[in-house]
Amino acid sequence: MNVKIKKLHNWDMTPTEAILLQRELAQKVSACGTLSSISLVAGADVWHSRTSGMGRAAVVVLSYPDMNLVEVSRSEGDCHIPYIPGLLSFREMPLLLSAFEGLESMPDLILMDGQGLAHPRRLGIASHLGLFLNKPVIGCAKSRLVGEYTPLADEAGSYSDLYHNSQLVGRVLRTRRGVNPLFISVGHKICLEEACSRVADCCRGYRLPEPLRHAHLAAAELI
């Protein structure tokens, strides 16, 4: 195991305490940084059973830029904390961190299925993960949590900036013509421009970029 994970805090806290912690941790998120070279990129996703409290996290590492499969790590267990809007990371992070601990090699960049700065308190799961790993993370969500944006064109590559309370928090990016766009935001240690560029580089004709598409399949045990 070559993945180093910081010990930021424990998980035994009330929703009120979690919100206060989010506000504190948000001050530590870096929304700048340039990746000089990338050889490995990972996608991370969490699957939840509809009939039980079980969850399964998957981290899939691909080579960059050719997107060949390198490694898959999974972790499953009970998600004891119920889903509360805005507090997703407190439900999913323990499983995610366990999956990252199972990796043999640490990726240079991580795409997380979820929000980064596009969050009411600027600490979505992608930003929270970035602080634990101290690595560049991009939030790549399939739906909007906060913010407003102008309609974008139907062509792949079209985008619109996402604003919340007059602050730029992300970008709405259409990765494939005729399909719903993705909501891209800074997770940690990367700027928004590069985050969107890297997501586009990882797309191979599907709505989801390859690291997240593989992570979604791995979490559902389809690969």
Swiss-Prot record:
Q: Which InterPro entries match?
A: Endonuclease-V (IPR007581)
Where does it live in the cell?
Answer: Cytoplasm
Record keyword Transport present = no
Q: Which reaction does it catalyse?
A: Endonucleolytic cleavage at apurinic or apyrimidinic sites to products with a 5'-phosphate
EC annotation from Swiss-Prot or TrEMBL: 3.1.21.7
Gene Ontology biological-process entries: DNA repair
> Its principal location?
cytoplasm
Looking at the UniProt record for this protein, which Gene Ontology cellular component terms does it annotate, in alphabetical order?
cytoplasm
Task: Determine if Acetylation is one of this entry's keywords.
Answer: no
**Chain positions of site Interaction with target DNA:** Y83
Q: Name one Pfam family in it.
A: Endonuclease_5
Q: Where does Mg(2+) bind?
A: D45, D113
Listed GO molecular functions? Answer: deoxyribonuclease V activity; magnesium ion binding; RNA endonuclease activity, producing 5'-phosphomonoesters; single-stranded RNA binding
The entry's keywords: Cytoplasm, DNA damage, DNA repair, Endonuclease, Hydrolase, Magnesium, Metal-binding, Nuclease
What cofactors does this protein use? Mg(2+)
Supply the enzyme class, top level.
hydrolase
Q: Hey, which family's this protein in?
A: Belongs to the endonuclease V family.
Job description of the protein: DNA repair enzyme involved in the repair of deaminated bases. Selectively cleaves double-stranded DNA at the second phosphodiester bond 3' to a deoxyinosine leaving behind the intact lesion on the nicked DNA.
Q: What PANTHER family does the database record attribute to this sequence? A: ENDONUCLEASE V
Its protein name is Endonuclease V
